[in-house]
Amino acid sequence: MEYVKGILLAILMISFLSINAQVRVDSHIVFKDTVYQFGSVEEGSDAECVFSFINKGKTPFAITNVKTFCGCIDLRWTKEPVKPGQSGKISVKFYASNPGTFSKTIKVFTTDRGEQSIDLTIKGSVSIKPGKE
C-alpha cells in the first residue's frame, strides 16, 4: 500500500511541475508608473498624461484592449507588438466637466500571460471655472 501511495505522490508532483512549466511567462509588461496625479484641473478643460511601459520579457507582447468605465476619458495606445527591451505608451485625455475630486481606473489587457489585466489610475480635482460660481 505504501508503494502505491509513493507512486501516486510522484505522479502528482510530476503533474504539478509540468503544469507550472506550461504557464512560464516569457513576456512581461512593466509600467514606469501606474498612478498619475493631475492636481487641480479647471472645469471645462482637458488634462493629458502618458503611461509609459517596457517589455522586460523574452518574447513580444501586445496590448489587446484598454478600457475605462467613464465617458470623460479618451485613450490611445501602442497597437503594434512590443519586442523585448522596447517600450510603448498609453496616452490619456481627461475631460474635466464635473467639479470635485476624481479617481478613474483604466484597465489594460495584454497578451502577457502573467497578467489578467493591469490597472492604471488617474486622480485629481476639478475646480469650478472662474465666474461660474
Regions found by a protein language model. Name each.
Residues 58-86:
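Surface-exposed binding patches on compact interaction domains or structured appendages
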Residues 95, 109-113:
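Beta-strand-rich extracellular modules
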Residues 21-45, 52, 113-133:
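Long, low-complexity ectodomains and other extracytoplasmic segments of secretory-pathway proteins
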Residues 39, 77-82, 93-94:
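Beta-strand-rich interaction surfaces with strong enrichment in secreted/lumenal proteins
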